[in-house]
Amino acid sequence: MSGSARVRPQDDERLIDSLRWYLVLVGAGAVVVLRFLLEGAAGPDSSSSQIFFRLLAVGEPFPIALAFMYSLLVLWQVQSAPAAAAGTHSPDACRPLGRRFVAAAVALSMTLTFAVAIGLHGAFPFSMDEWAVRFQSRLFLAGRIVGALDTAIPFLREVARPVFVFSTGDGNGWVSGYLPTYSLLLMPFEAIGYPWLLNVLCNAGSVLAVAHVGRQLWGPDDDRPVVAALALAASSQFMAAAATTYTMPAHLLVNLLWLAAMLGEGRAWLWAGPLALVALTLHQPVPHALFAAPFLARLLVERDWKRFAWILTWWIASGCVVLWWSGLMTGRLPTFGANGVLYWPNAATLVVLLLHVMLLFTWSSPLMPLLMLIGCRRWEERTKTERDLAAGIVLSLAFYLCFRLVTQGHGWGWRYGHQVLGSVALLAATGWPRFRAVVGITAARRWLALSLALSVFVLFPTRAKLMLRLSLPFAMAGEWLRSQPERYLVIPTDSLWYGQDLVRNEATLTSPVLLHGAALTGEELRVLENEQGRPVRRIRVDELRQFGIERLPRPHSK
């Protein structure tokens, strides 16, 4: 068309607007990450939340650049020749995406996860969140709920206590600070020495579950269930979490099974009750509560009292489990205020909110955020279930603005939002028909294939390299510490980056017992030396630096 501007269809304009908004979001995230780099966030720091900013500074520049370039290329194609694209496709392109793609996605995702888990010294528990649930699982295997401390020295109960393991009310035992169901599920895998297999199987189940939910929503002959399964399977965060013993893959699977039950025919919805009990007691009730709340609110609005009462009964049972487990420790529940885990957000947390959204997108396959935005832009076309999925994502973002450790500390991708990855995949699939209509079937599938290839063969290996870089020093240092002959080893926890995470002891306090050097007083040290009849060994910083553990910078004098 010469001499006049082409009048674009509404679909073209909405797609272009979605691309532009995504580019703005990624660009804003890039500016924040650049600021972290310039302020030295790539180096070690003593703050417990600093690892979040360090991972952003070290790990995000390349994925952000790749997401930006990919989106620019899609925008260029849509703007340059949208009319021709929609009518150009090969005969084979009209065939729906078959279930074989789902099977291939499961196989490839599991293979990559296996490789990374083995490379991580058998999914070494880099974070104390991972170690604590395994600690509790080992207690269950020994036939105990609480680990009775085998010591006559009272102060050892604290100076030897690992992070996220808490003293019981009487002070004579230890118990995990997390709810018990995930540790129960972990037991057979911990017993055979492959605890990470649980999350690998959870991932396989999640891909199959999201495809099943997609077929419930859109029918078996639609491309969207397969697109949702591929979107989930190719997510770097999805694969990375399965190479760990974080509880998040289990949360994701149970949420998807719960949704499948709610959407099922006949009396299938009855399974939503016991599944809610499992989900609410995996390790924390919040991940499932945020996911399920919009669906439960809709039951109230539609006056579906029967289903609501059934699920509420199981929620009450879950609350009893939470109260009982809390009673094993201090009996305190999360509260607002200076001493609670919840607090009122401030302006700085809005920046963290932006970063959470960015991580949710940049750890996904590059096309998926665009498809999700396209689908959500057509809000009037979304079904009740699709809207509830979107509301669950928004609720998760909003809740963690009020969480004291809003930056999540350790975690690959946006760990706090892992339970909504299925929602992201399903909402991304809602944008697929419009994207395909604008760019054409053949072009759409090519962009999808490129997105999946970049995620699996470029982004995930990049993420895995960072996981290895950060985790292996702690794995090797931990093995070395466990091989030392002394009864007590004092770790210079205040001089090492995340030095407190090296203190990992069973309740039996088998040798060597690792101690928090920062918490041990001189008098307590003398008591230990007198008990042993020989000096307690102080581990030097240089002894641990040989494995790659980093020294903390000395604080500036005031």
Map each language-model feature to its residues:
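Membrane-lumen/periplasm interface segments of specific transmembrane helices
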Residues: 280-374, 396
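Hydrophobic, aromatic-rich transmembrane alpha-helices
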Residues: 1-3, 71-80, 205-211, 292-302, ...
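Transmembrane-helix signature of polytopic, membrane-embedded enzymes
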Residues: 102-105, 210-236, 252-253, 266-271, ...
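Signature aromatic-anchored transmembrane alpha helix within multi-pass, membrane-resident enzymes
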Residues: 97-107, 226, 270, 311-319, ...
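Hydrophobic/aromatic-rich transmembrane helices and adjacent perimembrane loops
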Residues: 133-134, 248, 388-391, 409-436
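Multi-pass, polyprenyl lipid-linked donor-dependent membrane glycosyltransferases
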Residues: 128, 196-208, 227-257, 262, ...
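Transmembrane alpha-helix segments characteristic
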Residues: 26-33, 103-113, 226-228, 232, ...
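Interfacial juxtamembrane loops and adjacent helix segments
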Residues: 142-182, 186, 340
